[in-house]
Each structure stands twice: as structure tokens, then as C-alpha cells.
């Protein structure tokens, strides 16, 4: 592969997109959401990122790695899985978006249907935003739009997965949020001129090199949706000084 910081040409991008199906297109659009907001197609998003010079070869490699398209990494970039892993964490992609894609790929259709029902119970307005064909990443975006999920607060999704008995996925989200809170506190502790605060919903995500981190299961989390409105409102900790 040539320079990893090189911005690929538009013809190269078009040929690459021809190799992807509609599901993979939706995942790429989700991965690009923070850096290319407002784009409704993956082509628009990639063109926007190319104009911003954020769409480097390393970013494309990381996207394809998240999609598990090792065949394209080999044929288009001449990279093995191990070679691609050397470039992870060097692009604009956030751990939050990558983790959501990983979680969604582990869910079957019945679990996704249940998650959509849980979401509509939490916020009835989501019934108009979601359909039977809505993918997991589209569910995540809908939850973001109503303030139930953000890069710094994924406890609502974790509770939903706990109800489905998908403790493996639930614990990945719990571990992620704990790490984000610890990172936020560390950044403020290292900056005496800034007030120390607990992490609040809506703050931006930070980048990590890991994709989906294995974690240990925990049994100390509350059950989901006994009182969904109250539980979702308690996810945002009080500001401290």
C-alpha cells in the first residue's frame, strides 16, 4: 500500500463502493456520521471526507477492517489482517462508532426487533423514526436524536441488551462507558485550570485504538425497563465541583 495518509481518488472510491452491499453502505455511513454530518448516502459522506482530506487510505483500511472485508483489504490494498491492524486507531473513526457497528453485527433479527420495541417504549416518538427494516445503527442514531444515547452515555443500550440476556454485549458497553468516564476525569485532573466534573451525556467521544474489547461479566447492574422513563433519566450524573 502507498502512503497511508494519502487521500484516495474518486474513481478508486467509486470502484470500492461497487464491492459493498446496501447493509455495508449503511455501516460506513454510520462510521462517518461525526465527521460528515448531514450526509444521507455513503457516497456523499466519502466525498465530503475526501474534500476535508480526512478520508485517507488508513481510514479506508480501518473502515473495511470494521466491516470484516478482509478480501478487499487484500485485493485493493495488498494488506493482510495483521497488516491492517497496524493502522487501526490512526484515522478519524471513533471507538464509539466502531463499537456500535461491532455490537450490531452480533445481533440476530429477533433481538433487533426486541430492541426496537424497547426503544419505542422508552420514547414513543421513535415509532415514527423506526421501521421493521431499521438496522441497529439506525436505531442508535434514532436514540441519539432524542438524547437517550451519546458517545459518552450508552447505559440505555446496555440495559436493553441486559434484558435480552446478551450480557456479553451489555458488558462491552458498560466497560466502554466506564473507560470514557475515567478518561474524562483524568483529562480534567491533569488540567488544574479547568473545573473537575463528572461525565455528562452529550459530550463528544474520544478515539481509541481498540475495536470491541472483551470484558468480564458483571451482575451488579439493575434490570431494564421496569420504570423506563425513570431509569433513563437517572443515567446522567449530577455535576460536581
UniProtKB/Swiss-Prot annotation:
<dbReference type="GO" id="GO:0140321">
    <property type="term" value="P:symbiont-mediated suppression of host autophagy"/>
</dbReference>
<dbReference type="GO" id="GO:0033668">
    <property type="term" value="P:symbiont-mediated suppression of host apoptosis"/>
</dbReference>
<protein>
    <recommendedName>
        <fullName>Viral CASP8 and FADD-like apoptosis regulator</fullName>
    </recommendedName>
</protein>
<feature type="compositionally biased region" description="Polar residues">
    <location>
        <begin position="229"/>
        <end position="241"/>
    </location>
</feature>
<dbReference type="GO" id="GO:2001234">
    <property type="term" value="P:negative regulation of apoptotic signaling pathway"/>
</dbReference>
<feature type="domain" description="DED 2">
    <location>
        <begin position="95"/>
        <end position="175"/>
    </location>
</feature>
<dbReference type="Pfam" id="PF01335">
    <property type="entry name" value="DED"/>
</dbReference>
<keyword id="KW-0053">Apoptosis</keyword>
<feature type="region of interest" description="Disordered">
    <location>
        <begin position="212"/>
        <end position="241"/>
    </location>
</feature>
<keyword id="KW-1035">Host cytoplasm</keyword>
<dbReference type="InterPro" id="IPR001875">
    <property type="entry name" value="DED_dom"/>
</dbReference>
<keyword id="KW-1119">Modulation of host cell apoptosis by virus</keyword>
<keyword id="KW-0945">Host-virus interaction</keyword>
<comment type="subunit">
    <text>Associates with the death-inducing signaling complex (DISC) formed by TNFRSF6/FAS, FADD and CASP8. Interacts with FADD. Interacts with host TRAF2. Interacts with host NEMO/IKBKG (via N-terminus). Interacts with host SH3BP4; this interaction plays an important in the suppression of host autophagy.</text>
</comment>
<dbReference type="GO" id="GO:0042025">
    <property type="term" value="C:host cell nucleus"/>
</dbReference>
<feature type="domain" description="DED 1">
    <location>
        <begin position="8"/>
        <end position="78"/>
    </location>
</feature>
<comment type="function">
    <text>Inhibits TNFRSF1A, TNFRSF6/FAS and TNFRSF12 induced apoptosis. Directs the degradation of host NFKBIB but not NFKBIA. Also suppresses host NF-kappa-B activation by interacting with and preventing ubiquitination of host NEMO/IKBKG, the NF-kappa-B essential modulator subunit of the IKK complex. Interferes with host CASP8/caspase-8 recruitment and activation at the death-inducing signaling complex (DISC). May lead to higher virus production and contribute to virus persistence and oncogenicity. Also participates in the inhibition of host autophagy by interacting with host SH3BP4.</text>
</comment>
<dbReference type="GO" id="GO:0030430">
    <property type="term" value="C:host cell cytoplasm"/>
</dbReference>
<keyword id="KW-1082">Inhibition of host apoptosis by viral FLIP-like protein</keyword>
<keyword id="KW-0677">Repeat</keyword>
<keyword id="KW-1048">Host nucleus</keyword>
<keyword id="KW-1083">Inhibition of host autophagy by virus</keyword>
<dbReference type="GO" id="GO:0060545">
    <property type="term" value="P:positive regulation of necroptotic process"/>
</dbReference>
<dbReference type="GO" id="GO:0085034">
    <property type="term" value="P:symbiont-mediated suppression of host NF-kappaB cascade"/>
</dbReference>
<dbReference type="InterPro" id="IPR011029">
    <property type="entry name" value="DEATH-like_dom_sf"/>
</dbReference>
Amino acid at each position: 500500500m502507498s502512503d497511508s495518509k494519502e487521500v484516495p481518488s474518486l474513481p478508486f472510491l467509486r470502484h470500492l463502493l461497487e464491492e459493498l452491499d446496501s447493509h455495508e453502505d449503511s455501516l460506513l455511513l454510520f462510521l462517518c456520521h461525526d465527521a460528515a454530518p448531514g450526509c444521507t448516502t455513503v457516497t456523499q459522506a466519502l466525498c465530503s471526507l475526501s474534500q476535508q482530506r480526512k478520508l485517507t487510505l488508513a481510514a479506508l483500511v480501518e473502515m473495511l477492517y470494521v466491516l470484516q472485508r478482509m478480501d478487499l483489504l487484500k485485493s485493493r490494498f495488498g494488506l493482510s489482517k495483521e497488516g491492517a491492524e497496524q493502522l487501526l486507531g490512526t484515522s478519524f473513526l471513533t471507538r464509539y462508532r466502531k463499537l456500535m457497528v461491532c455490537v450490531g453485527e452480533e445481533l440476530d433479527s429477533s433481538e433487533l426487533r426486541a430492541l426496537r420495541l424497547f426503544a419505542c417504549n422508552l420514547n414513543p416518538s421513535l415509532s415514527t423514526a423506526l421501521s421493521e427494516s431499521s438496522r441497529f445503527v439506525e436505531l442508535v442514531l434514532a436514540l441519539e436524536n432524542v438524547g437517550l444515547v451519546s458517545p459518552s452515555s450508552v447505559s440505555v443500550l446496555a440495559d436493553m441488551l441486559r434484558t435480552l440476556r446478551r450480557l456479553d454485549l451489555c458488558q462491552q458497553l458498560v466497560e466502554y462507558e466506564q473507560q470514557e468516564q475515567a478518561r474524562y476525569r483524568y483529562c480534567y485532573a491533569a488540567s488544574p485550570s479547568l473545573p473537575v466534573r463528572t461525565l455528562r451525556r452529550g459530550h463528544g467521544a474520544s478515539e481509541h485504538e481498540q475495536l470491541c474489547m472483551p470484558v468480564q461479566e458483571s451482575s451488579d447492574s439493575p434490570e431494564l425497563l421496569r420504570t423506563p422513563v425513570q431509569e433513563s433519566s437517572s443515567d446522567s450524573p449530577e455535576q460536581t465541583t
